[in-house]
Design a protein with these regions (language model features):
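Multi-pass, polyprenyl lipid-linked donor-dependent membrane glycosyltransferases
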Residues: 57, 87, 109-116, 140-170, ...
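Extracytosolic helix-loop segments that constitute the early lumenal/periplasmic catalytic or substrate-binding loops
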Residues: 60-84, 91-92, 264-281
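Loop-to-helix entry region of an early transmembrane alpha helix in multi-pass inner-membrane enzymes
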Residues: 86, 90-98, 102-122, 154, ...
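Membrane-interface alpha helices of multi-pass inner-membrane proteins
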Residues: 97, 142, 146, 174, ...
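Transmembrane-helix signature of polytopic, membrane-embedded enzymes
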Residues: 108, 121-149, 165-166, 181, ...
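Membrane-interface anchor segments at the N-terminal boundary of transmembrane helices
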Residues: 108, 317-404
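Membrane-interface transmembrane helices that cradle and orient dolichyl/undecaprenyl
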Residues: 130-132, 169-185, 211-215, 440-443
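Membrane-proximal stem/loop segments at transmembrane-domain junctions that anchor or position
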Residues: 248-348
Length: 453
């Protein structure tokens, strides 16, 4: 009976306990959420006007690939990319190509990022309202979301996460309308999300689960699958025409797997394995002759070989990969240092602690304050989210939320199989915030009911 109440919506306890009914309390929260949104928008406009797009690592490579494509009059991927190490960020790179062709730079991505942030926010509020009704949870969610500095700094980043999230959360919200045609659009959005970042399949599976909880009609399932399948075929077909391969999505799986499953792996992104003497080493001749597909297969083969020989070591790395993925929220805050590499990593945090404790001659900067604030908000949110999941399961009220819990677990599970990194939890951050908002409201409701008694 316990497990049925967790997974079967009809057997689960109702979710109507989360509305306090207090008009004054609700009005205050509504005002706070409006203030939080206005403050976030103000900061974002400031970033938009005063900061250029910061590039490093993946974003630098996206820019280079887009620039090269524009010079050669092609889209991505093309025949120019057949011998690349991997194909990745397909959707974003093509957007950057469009931006360069229309405006001469990639600065327009900042407007796209702001649009995506509010698309994510609106989608999540809609999801909350469909599950819990017109409760205060939506306002708590808005306050926490807008108070998280990640959504300020990411405005000036050229990365895949925001576009992916806008499509993925938009697709999920559309599924909850209960209409057949929106399921078709949802399928298209899931496919576009996966085109941008290969995590869309986790959200798609959760979407199908969501339809199950809603007791959807067969037509809704068919429209969802049809929308996704047609979009995949169209994008893959265009890529095949351009480069001779059905390159619909990123092929970074083998590369990332080898980083997390090789001699010397520590759960983080370490590139020594690709150097001379490493399991992933390829000579210049091999690199120039092998296609991205062949390289991906080679990396996967080497990783699987190591896993078979060292299963215990591979499993031992999984908790660290999860920790590395969840511990930091500074990956977007390099914007405020005008350095995409700042705001993250052990060396940065050691320096920050030194400035905080006075052990360093350097004083805290405004960017440091933003990092400290964002990290504090995130850590509290993460703890509240974990407690919320336990609370919902123990109280047998998790059934309607299991698709979202699955999404979070699935995204973290992927990093545990491959390689960890703080950025990798960004796509599920709104669900973490949502869980924290649910717990805060449940505590407020319980407290109010006790006062009434």
């Amino acid at each position: 009976m316990f497990f049925r109440q967790i997974f079967d919506v009809r057997a689960a306890e109702p979710l109507n306990i989360f509305s306090s009914g207090g008009r004054k309390y609700k009005s205050v929260l509504k005002i706070l959420s409006i203030i939080a949104m206005a403050a976030m928008l103000g900061i974002q406009i400031y970033v938009l006007l005063t900061h250029k797009v910061v590039l490093a690592s993946d974003s630098q490579r996206y820019f280079e690939l887009a620039t090269n494509a524009v010079k050669n009059g092609v889209w991505y991927p093309s025949s120019l990319n057949i011998h690349d190490t991997y194909i990745f960020g397909n959707g974003l790179i093509n957007l950057l190509i469009l931006s360069i062709r229309l405006t001469g730079s990639i600065e327009a991505i900042k407007f796209v990022n702001i649009f995506c942030i509010y698309a994510i926010l609106i989608s999540c509020i809609y999801i909350i309202r469909k599950i819990f009704g017109d409760t205060e949870i939506q306002y708590w969610f808005t306050v926490i979301f807008c108070s998280t500095g990640t959504f300020w700094g990411e405005v000036a980043q050229a990365r895949t996460e925001l576009i992916f999230m806008a499509f993925a959360f938009g697709a999920t919200a559309l599924l909850m309308t209960g209409k057949i045609y929106t399921c078709l659009i949802s399928g298209i959005f899931f496919a576009l999300a996966n085109w941008t970042r290969p995590l869309g399949v986790v959200f798609l599976i959760a979407g199908i689960w969501l339809l199950v909880t809603q007791r959807a009609k067969l037509k809704q399932y068919l429209c969802l699958v049809l929308g996704a399948a047609v979009t995949v075929c169209v994008i893959g077909g265009i890529a095949y025409f351009n480069c001779g391969y059905f390159a619909y999505q990123a092929t970074t799986g083998g590369y990332n797997l080898l980083m997390g499953a090789s001699e010397g792996a520590d759960g983080t992104s370490k590139f020594e394995v690709f150097g001379e003497g490493g399991a992933g080493y390829l000579s210049e001749k091999q690199k120039s002759e092998m296609t991205f597909k062949e390289k991906d297969a080679f990396y996967k083969s080497e990783a699987m070989k190591w896993i078979k020989e060292n299963p215990g070591d591979y499993i031992k790395l999984m908790p660290k990969k999860m920790l590395v993925t969840l511990y930091s929220e500074g990956y977007s805050l390099g914007t405020f240092y005008n350095d995409a590499t700042a705001g993250n990593g052990g060396a940065f945090y050691r320096g920050l602690i030194g400035r905080m404790t006075g052990q360093s001659e350097e004083k805290l900067s405004s960017a440091d304050i933003i990092v400290i604030w964002t990290q504090a908000v995130y850590m509290v949110t993460l703890v509240l989210a974990f407690v919320c999941v336990v609370f919902l399961i123990v109280k047998r009220r998790a059934a309607k939320l299991m698709p979202f819990i699955f999404t979070v677990a699935g995204a973290i599970g992927v990093t545990m199989l491959l390689v960890g990194g703080p950025r990798y939890h960004f796509p599920i951050l709104p669900y973490i915030i949502m869980a924290a908002a649910i717990l805060i409201q449940s505590v407020a409701t319980i407290k109010e009911h006790k006062n009434e008694a």
